Amino acid sequence: LVQNRAWGDLGDWLGLEDEKNDKSLLWEAYFIYDLELMNKIATILGKQMDAERFSKLYAERKTFFNKTYIRPNDGKTIFSSFLPKKRGTSIDIQTSYVLPLAFNIINDEQKEKAIKNLLETITRENTTDCGKLCPSYSLMTGFIGTAWIGKALSDNGYSDIAYRLLQQTSYPSWLYSVEQGATTIWERLNSYTHLDGFGGNNRMNSFNHYSFGAVGSWMYNYSLGIQRDEAFPGFKHFILKPAIDLAGKMKYAKGY
């Protein structure tokens, strides 16, 4: 795992707390996720030696991750030796929990604590890297964390929190953009506002950008409840298991 210094390491791009994160946690989590996928691929292709190698490396990196990034007593995410001055201090932001929970990396002994910590980062007020205070149930994740936050919540029994995030209208949230007139997914949640127009940092600003739209995967898999069965590729067998909005605000979901 090598930091791409030419690009300055984009990390959880446009996450409002990205500067509080240990970017190496993101690299390591995705490396472990990739190893799991490679093990499955090698197994399907009948490459047993490769499958065993990936499986062994997966177990080793998972152990490393838990020892390096998860504090044993409270399950909080912590900085690694990649940032020596911060080593062992809390990260404790949404994305730092979302990836290891969505990828099922955290050991069983710490998992419930980590889930509790993720919920705390969502239900509390948070401060952006620029010092702006955001209300509870704000989407503080960037391009990486946003793709997985719904899965991390729903897979651990908290679809109600995922729905609450989805239905939030204050900044930062998906519907904030809609309230400002969005008919597409924007690169930034506040690319345009009624108050400031196109003010602010518009040097890099797409008005048709997928990344925050990754929530669509959660809507398909959990709100609609249509999920694939890995044992039967191509949806030869699939799972229908919609997650109900217990607050009753989303009364139906339609799709295929």
State what each model feature region is:
Residues 26, 30-33, 37-40, 53, ...:
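Extracytoplasmic/secreted proteins, especially bacterial periplasmic and envelope-associated proteins
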Residues 30-48, 96-109, 148-157, 220-226:
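Well-ordered alpha-helical scaffold segments within catalytic/enzyme domains
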Residues 1, 56-76, 107-132, 158-177:
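Long, well-ordered core segments of solenoidal/helical folds
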Residues 9-26, 72-88, 99-103, 116-139, ...:
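Active-site-adjacent structural elements in folded domains
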Residues 22-33, 91-95, 140-144, 210-214:
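Aromatic- and histidine-enriched alpha-helix N-cap/loop-to-helix transition segments
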Residues 160-256:
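Non-catalytic C-terminal accessory modules of carbohydrate-active enzymes
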Residues 1-27, 45-98, 109, 168, ...:
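Active-site acid/base region of carbohydrate-active enzymes
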